[in-house]
Amino acid sequence: MLNILFADGFEEVEALSVVDMARRAGIEVKMISLNETNEVIGGHNISIICDCMLKDAAIDDGVVLPGGIPGVPNIEKNPDAIEFIKKHYNENKLIAAICAAPTLLGRIGLLDNKKAVCYPDLMDELICKEKVDENVVIDSNIITSKSAGTALDFAFEIIKYLKDETVAKKVKNAIYY
């Protein structure tokens, strides 16, 4: 199962592209609210209802951190969310972050020995072993990506990681990508 963290102010395209493409690939996805209810409001005032709240979530195959401001700061100020992310990391599970979210991973020490990318205007804030100017960067169990414009590529790399290239190609073909 793939966990996706939703905090108020999340970037809708980055989060929901991953949910949609992963489900099309047959990956079970759990949308996790960091709020006191299952409802979360995105950065562009799109409300979604998550599957559960963080207190009811478990460590699974991976965790995705969408970008967005104030979405990423809202994840970062939640100590339970940080612990949840670190538990996935410590169990060598997939950690995928896009846009502003890789900067959070850097600040909590998860990119110390990794190459990564983030939203171009935030590259100076990215703490990692090597900054790479690519749309999606994969280093071991960490996948990072630039922005809403690279969200589908990000989703397909997550599918490749959890399934394989063939499944990712089938989903791409199904949406005429």
Report the location of each language-model feature.
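A conserved active-site-flanking secondary-structure segment within enzyme catalytic domains
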Residues: 111-136
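Short, hydrophobic beta-strand segments that form beta-sheet elements in well-ordered domains
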Residues: 30-33, 95-99, 115-119
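Extended, subdomain-level signal for the structured scaffold at the beginning of enzyme domains
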Residues: 1-91, 104-107, 125-133, 141-177
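Conserved beta-strand segments that form the floor/walls of ligand-binding pockets within enzyme
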Residues: 5, 64, 96-97, 117, ...
